[in-house]
Amino acid sequence: MVGIIGRKLGMTTVFDETGNAIAVTVVEAGPCTVMQVRDNEKDGYNAIQLGYGAVKEKHLKKPQIGQFKKANLEPKKYLKEFRLDDSSAYTVGQELKVDIFQAGDFIDVSSLSKGRGFAGVMKRHNYDGGPMSHGSNFRRRAGSIGCNSYPARVWKGKGMPGHMGNTLTTIQNLKVVEIRPEDNLIMIKGSIPGAINGIVKITQAAKKKNKKKNSMTK
């Protein structure tokens, strides 16, 4: 399913036709350039690689510079791949804009969540902790993390202190409230992961079909 790359600008409130206030996230989406086209015959699957955001050549590695020069395209800072059922409708250098979506569509949004640094188990995993009085030294500790004799190891996935946040997070079935093609803006109902200016990947909802079929070859 095709999508677009964008940048989170923040949240605001808009009003619908009946005067109801709706909290929306504003994303500057695109324009994105098709950097590569993959197909079943050559690559074993159908996909396109989109590039977003200008970048100076001195900030890129040599393999990246070679890729852009081979395609005769301007360097892009962010590259993301989008799987498709059929990639034959796309060509290298083609530009995709936010108008591939329309108000009322449902989308999936992926981005890095806000990093919270090192956190304990109570903040990171919502543990209850221990007693807070009567001479307790347990307080905010994790408690037992396994058994001595069996399995004699810590199970994979056990909640432990560590780096909280800064993970790829996807929220599904968010509704598009408004599109402003002249400003490359898309307004999404509710909140999305990540900090302001964070890079966002937007795709058609995988689990919910849109009422009207969009033309993805604009």
Swiss-Prot record:
Any GO MF annotation of the entry: structural constituent of ribosome
UniProt KW keywords: Ribonucleoprotein, Ribosomal protein, RNA-binding, rRNA-binding
InterPro entries: Ribosomal_uL3, Ribosomal_uL3_bac/org-type, Ribosomal_uL3_CS, Transl_B-barrel_sf
SUPFAM superfamilies cross-referenced by the UniProt entry: Translation proteins
Record bears the keyword Nucleotide-binding: no
GO cellular component: cytosolic large ribosomal subunit
GO biological process: translation
Ribosomal protein recorded as keyword: yes
Lineage top rank: taxon: Bacteria
Family: Belongs to the universal ribosomal protein uL3 family.
NCBIfam families: L3_bact
HAMAP family tied to this protein: Ribosomal_uL3_B (MF_01325_B)
Subunit structure: Part of the 50S ribosomal subunit. Forms a cluster with proteins L14 and L19.
Role noted for this protein: One of the primary rRNA binding proteins, it binds directly near the 3'-end of the 23S rRNA, where it nucleates assembly of the 50S subunit.
Protein name (Swiss-Prot/TrEMBL): Large ribosomal subunit protein uL3
Record organism: Brachyspira pilosicoli (Serpulina pilosicoli)
Gene that encodes it: rplC
